Curated annotation (Swiss-Prot):
PROSITE patterns in UniProt: KH_TYPE_1, S1
Keyword Transferase found: yes
Species of origin: Francisella tularensis subsp. novicida (strain U112)
Ranges in coiled-coil conformation: none
Name of this protein: Polyribonucleotide nucleotidyltransferase
InterPro entries: ExoRNase_PH_dom1 (IPR001247), ExoRNase_PH_dom2 (IPR015847), ExoRNase_PH_dom2_sf (IPR036345), KH_dom (IPR004087), KH_dom_type_1 (IPR004088), KH_dom_type_1_sf (IPR036612), NA-bd_OB-fold (IPR012340), PNPase (IPR012162)
NCBIfam families: polynuc_phos, PRK11824.1
Gene (name only): pnp
């Protein structure tokens, strides 16, 4: 067993790459270690293309084992179940980073599995998994020449932090992950606290310059441990077939791409495709040698060339816009009468119905991870039904990876403006239903979420808007597109999503289909996105620019009380009897804390007020010189104990009773008396006198 090892430093932390010791049946196997974190990453490459495959079947699976943190899984089976949303998001992050590095037309299946074997809690293992995925690919024999690396960057007190730990990130205004090759940026994922575009760009460039160290280490490992390059073929469009279709149908295709409506354009293009198939199969140009798949791929290549060349030549885009124009926007709030908050955001042919629901602490999501169980007060879910693109399909299934990814992006975009628990005790769930989609539905979700929460009375710090930018690049010529359509996303080279407030960026996500982009393009895209974002915010602000002061009449009510911690036991009562009685009488939910915090959550104001009044009566403090109506709770030889407020009793001597002209032999337990608090001693004992009738 021969072990190969590479060691490098990243942010003053030593990282070790090692191969040859584990999982030797895989084509590529690398363990990545940093401190007590260990991630095993394997790559398996199929040596032939499966029949009928017309895409690159790359799959990435990031898995966390609970034993890595010295824990036993919960649940009846006591074993790991399906991957959590966080694990799915990390899988997507790795996939998006490495996918652009493979040659176009490479259709061999590749599966990458990253398994967290040991975890110390200080650093997230995601960057180690990304580095390991690249290293295992580099030694697997796959056609992976442009080695990719990734780093995380934070930003605190005006300084960038390389490879920040979890504590650093809690204090950071930025959580930025950048991946790329030695000379190009391929993927960006970030969450920020309304930072200027210049800081975001600086963070991306700062991250990129530190990739070289990692890439050099991977290359050194590959030089000594790589398997022979597999034999593979690259699928290519048949140029002769493409020329035949273009010579006969280019005019019709060109006219179809002047139709602004997506549905009408697709109807026209489908009719042309049908005619193309009939022509090729019935003509004398060796049409019968071609499959339907080959013909349609050649047709698609003509479409791609047409759309891209039009934009690069300065001609109008598919829907007639110039590169910087935003589609028409329509904003409505309060569109659903029975919900707590709602908004309908429409941008061109993309439409999101976003609904906000308010709940109590008991509605918070409990998220289990290697760090333990965390309470999540803000949830955002994204649904993409098939009818949104005019198709039939599966409905009501578990969310797909894309839906999870879009929801996470929208949540990260709005997280920076979401109020903390002290300022806003509600738990909030936001759901985005995509009713129509023609590009940038995740950014429509960002806008709709901001509007919906303001409609529900959630005190977000600032409205947030999002915009998707695109890129068409051919050699030195390029065009940056604002507010891209679905076809422009599909046929273009970049999907660059930017969300933020009027003050700066809160989230940024970039995916590249080509071999990276330059600083100049990044700067232009960020500036163009800033202008577009402010335009969208202006339209949103015309409808609502700050949260409503009161929640909806149909929304639940919540009230937070801070009482003397010693009084919590009085509110709860023996065996919980007192609090249960309040709940039964009012229908409210009551949560208490040893710190003295009491949360009252009720379906309406009447129930809440009743519960609050009952609690206030229990915890009220008696004061000297005040008169109270009490009840006798205990008879003694020398006097009686009278209950005043809640569990507070006072002592009333017989002498005081007789002095007031009342006979002591007529007193019984439960009898009402009006008494005056004469004094309260240092021990809290209360002495009473009887108020004369």
């Amino acid at each position: 067993m021969k072990i190969f090892r590479e060691v490098f430093e990243l942010g003053n932390k030593e990282i070790i790459l090692e191969t040859g010791g584990m999982a030797r049946q895989a084509d590529g196997s690398v363990t990545v270690s940093c401190g007590n974190n260990v991630v095993l990453v394997t790559t398996v490459v199929k040596k032939s293309v499966a029949d009928g495959t017309d895409f690159f079947p790359l799959s990435v699976h990031y898995l966390e084992k609970t034993y890595a943190a010295g824990k036993i899984p919960g649940g009846f089976l006591r074993r790991e179940g399906r991957p959590s949303e966080e694990q799915i998001l990390i899988s997507r992050l790795i996939d998006r980073s490495i996918r652009p590095s493979f040659p176009d037309g490479f259709f061999n299946e590749i599966q990458i599995v990253a398994t967290v074997l040991s975890y110390d809690g200080a650093f997230s293992p995601d960057i180690l998994a990304l580095i390991g995925a690249s290293a295992s690919l580099a030694i697997s024999g796959a056609p992976y020449d442009d080695v990719v690396a990734g780093v995380r960057v934070g930003y605190t007190n005006g300084k960038y932090i390389l490879n920040p730990n979890k504590q650093d990130l809690r204090d950071s205004d930025l959580d930025l992950v950048v991946s790329g090759t030695d000379d190009a940026i391929l993927m960006v994922e970030s969450e920020a606290n309304s930072l200027p575009e210049s800081v975001m760009l600086g963070g991306i460039l700062y991250a990129h310059k530190h990739l070289k160290t990692i890439i050099n280490s991977i290359n050194r490992l590959a030089k000594v441990a790589s398997k022979p390059r597999i034999e593979y073929s690259i699928y290519q469009i048949n140029k002769f077939l493409k020329s035949q279709i273009k010579s006969q149908f280019f005019g019709e295709i060109k006219n179809a791409y002047t139709i602004a409506s997506k549905q009408e354009r697709n109807l026209k293009l489908n009719a042309i495709r049908k005619n193309v198939l009939e022509y090729i199969f019935s003509s004398d140009v060796d049409g019968n040698e071609y499959t339907e798949k080959e013909i349609l791929e050649a047709f698609h290549d003509i479409e791609k060339d047409l759309v891209r060349s039009n934009i690069l030549e300065g001609k109008p885009r598919i829907d007639g816009r110039c590169t910087e124009t935003i589609r028409p926007i329509n904003v409505k709030i309060g569109v659903l009468p029975g919900v707590h908050g709602s908004a309908l955001f429409t941008r061109g042919e993309t439409q999101a119905l976003v609904v906000t629901t308010l709940g109590s602490d008991r509605d918070a999501q409990l998220v289990e991870s290697l760090d333990g169980i965390e309470k999540c007060r803000y949830m955002l879910h994204y649904n993409f039904p098939p009818y949104s693109v005019g198709e039939c399909g599966m409905v009501g299934m578990a969310p797909k990876r894309r839906e999870i990814g879009h929801a996470n992006l929208a949540k990260r975009a709005t997280q920076a403006v979401f109020p903390n628990e002290e300022a806003y005790p509600y738990v909030v769930r936001v759901v985005s239903e995509i009713l129509e989609s023609n590009g940038s539905s995740s950014m429509a979700t960002v806008c709709g979420s901001s509007l919906s929460m303001m409609d529900a009375g959630v005190p977000i710090a600032e409205p947030v808007a999002g915009i998707a930018m695109g890129l068409i690049k051919d050699g030195a010529k390029y065009a940056v597109l604002s507010d891209i359509l679905g076809d422009e996303d599909h046929l273009g080279d970049m999907d660059f999503k930017v969300a933020g407030t009027r003050y700066g960026v809160t989230a940024l996500q970039m995916d590249i289909k080509i071999k990276g982009i330059s600083r100049e393009i990044l700067e232009q895209a960020l500036e163009q996105a800033r202008v577009g974002r402010l335009h969208i915010l202006g339209i949103m602000n015309e409808v609502i620019k700050e949260h409503k002061e009161a929640v909806s009449d149909v929304a639940p009510q919540i009230h937070v009380m801070n009482i003397n911690p010693a009084k919590i036991k009085d509110v709860v009562g023996r065996g919980g009897a007192t609090v249960k009685g309040i709940v039964e009488k009012t229908g409210a939910q009551i949560d208490t804390s040893d710190s003295g915090e009491v949360k009252v959550f009720a379906k309406d104001k009447k129930s809440m007020d009743m519960a609050v009044a009952m609690i206030e009566e229990i915890v009220a403090e008696v004061e000297e010189g005040q008169v109270y109506k009490g009840k006798i709770v205990k008879l003694l030889d020398s006097g009686v104990f009278v209950n005043l407020l809640g569990s507070q009793d006072g002592y009333l001597p017989f002498s005081e009773i007789e002095q007031a002209g009342m006979k002591t032999n007529s007193l019984v337990e439960g009898q009402g008396l009006e008494v005056l608090v004469q004094n309260i001693d240092r021990g809290g004992r209360v002495k009473l006198s009887l108020v004369a009738r």
